[in-house]
Amino acid sequence: MEEPTSSTNENKMKSPCESNKRKVDKKKKNLHRASAPEQSLKETEKAKYPTLVFYCRKNKKRNSNQLENNQPTESSTDPIKEKGDLDISAGSPQDGGQN
């Protein structure tokens, strides 16, 4: 008689009971996942401390006066604006540099 090969030993058939049990387990997990967000919403409503949010702009400098008055200062630190101001006062190359 022939002995069973290693491939037939490894591939055993699973009983229908095991596959049904897995389906039930998956349904329970899905049900638990669906009910989890409701519980977390209830917990977040009872926050102990208020949440503070700060908004900061990158590469923007503001003085304390600007925060109170919410007005920009007269002196500009923008290099593009300063270059444009110099071009206007000296005459732009498009005009031929003549005043």
From Swiss-Prot:
Instruction: Read off the InterPro entries from this record.
Output: SPAN-X_fam
Which residue stretches belong to region Disordered?
Answer: 1-99
Query: Where is there biased composition of kind Basic residues?
Result: 23-32
Bias type Basic and acidic residues, positions: 11-22
Highest taxon listed in the record's lineage = Eukaryota
Question: Which family does the UniProt entry place this protein in?
Answer: Belongs to the SPAN-X family.
The protein's name is: Sperm protein associated with the nucleus on the X chromosome N4
Q: Which organism is it from?
A: Homo sapiens
